[in-house]
C-alpha cells in the first residue's frame, strides 16, 4: 500500500 505523505512513483 502507498505510504501517506510519500510519492511511491518518485
Curated annotation (Swiss-Prot):
It is found in: Secreted. Its main location: secreted. Expressed by the skin glands. GO terms for biological process: blood vessel diameter maintenance; defense response; vasodilation. GO terms for cellular component: extracellular region. GO terms for molecular function: toxin activity. Keywords: Amphibian defense peptide, G-protein coupled receptor impairing toxin, Secreted, Toxin, Vasoactive, Vasodilator. The keyword Secreted applies. Belongs to the bradykinin-related peptide family. Induces relaxation of mouse trachea that has been precontracted with methacholine. May induce relaxation of arterial smooth muscle. May target bradykinin receptors (BDKRB). This is Bradykinin-like peptide AR-10. It comes from Ascaphus truei.
Amino acid at each position: 500500500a502507498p505510504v501517506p505523505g510519500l510519492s511511491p512513483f518518485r
